[in-house]
Amino acid sequence: MEKLQILTERQQTELNHAIIQYLQPLCQQDNHVLLDQLSKLLNIDQSTQESNNVEKVDNYLEKRWSTVLRLQKKIIDLENEISNLNNIINSTNSDNNGIILSKDKINWIPKGAVKQSYQCENIVTTVKLHPNLPLVLNGCNDGNLYIWNISNDDNTIPEKMIKAHTRAINKICFTYKKPYYLATCSSDLTIKIWDEKFNHIRTLNGHEHTVSSIQFSPVDNSILYSVSRDKNIRVWDIFQGISLKSFVGHSEWCRDLDIISSDTYGDFVLTCSNDQSARLSHANSGAGVAMIVGHSHVVETVKFLPSLQANKILDEYITKNTEQFPTIPLELLKDKTYNQLGFKYCITASRDNTIKLWLIPPPTIAPHRPPLPSKYNNSQSWLIAELKGHSSWVKSLCVHPNGKFIISGSDDKTIKFWDLSGLLETGYVNVVKTIIGHDGFINDIDFARLKEASDVSEEDLLKQVEKRMRCLFISGSADNSIKLWN
């Protein structure tokens, strides 16, 4: 019976040449007879090894062998990925449009196991997930910027390390739209702008002290906001490299900020400070329109709550418990101004170990004028709930894409997941998950941003969020590590 030929004639010739090429340096003078015999067996003329039909490639056999191993590993990885996807499909429901969505994806939180850990040589001060690529970025106390590839097997070597600043990097942020520019700010008083390939393209100078935090406008890649220990809030044009506006928002060190954009009124800036307060400002005019006062220590960070789910839960809670909020006019909860503004509630975290949830009074709107301080409650926000559970400073916050989970990181070395819907059941925002894994203070956390998408209707928003969610969550700590949670 004729033996089945697996290789073509050309492939067979290439393999024979590669075998002789591999054995030549191994066969010393004493073994040249053996090499000649093998060459004759394989029909190879050593004097004409470099034939017209076969191109000689150095270390050909070794390279082919390593390629096979890499391909085998890739096949195993793909088989595992297919298995995971099949598991997801098997546990899904189909919506009316035939789009298959995971039952639990919209409420995904980490189980608590560390999927991957990345170690730096210095304290990790800030972390950020790339908005599109499988990359983890972190800044360190020594000014180094690290870029790690989640898909790499070797988690000991970063994809890239950049000496970005001369002192600690305090915050990293990406633009909200493509191309994804990166900005970093530092205790060296500067802000640096980087292109999509992490090449430095510009340095922004203007702050007179530590630059604490930065964030891009959600609607304009050219606009960047920053806050500093010099108490100033600055608005930058990153392409021109100039400061467009500067205004003082606080009496002490300005720690953090969050930005939300309104189609009608432009950007609003929420800031917090060592003066134990937070402030809402209209970006274009610099006017303060609302204040948040109630913490007993430094306010470390602030976040707007997205309208998705949060507004409905909190409106219902206030309506059912009017005796607890006698100064909140119920008609205010239905004020359509909030729809135009894009914000209604926010959260703050402090060194008093608490997180507080606030209803922001809407600014006064007058024709042909920028928004003015609110006429409600002397422009003071109403405290709706206090989240207690951390035993030390709460320094980082993020909001789950579903809009109802709040995530916090603390100096007590824990990360907590809070469920707003607990207000309707128990009257409290309950902790639904606490994850522990760091040996030092939690300095920063980040949940993967939703994939970019076109505008969708309100009723389709939850489905769109579920489809666009990336189930990735990271944390950075004073123990010099970044952890990607499973």
Swiss-Prot record:
One of its GO terms (biological process) is cell division. WD repeats lie at residues 119-158, 164-205, 206-246, 249-291, 294-328, 329-368, 389-428, 437-483. GO terms for molecular function: dynein complex binding; microtubule plus-end binding. Disulfide bonds: none annotated. Keywords: Cell cycle, Cell division, Coiled coil, Cytoplasm, Cytoskeleton, Microtubule, Mitosis, Repeat, Transport, WD repeat. Belongs to the WD repeat LIS1/nudF family. This is Nuclear distribution protein PAC1. It comes from Candida albicans (strain SC5314 / ATCC MYA-2876). The lineage of its organism: Eukaryota, Fungi, Dikarya, Ascomycota, Saccharomycotina. The gene is PAC1.
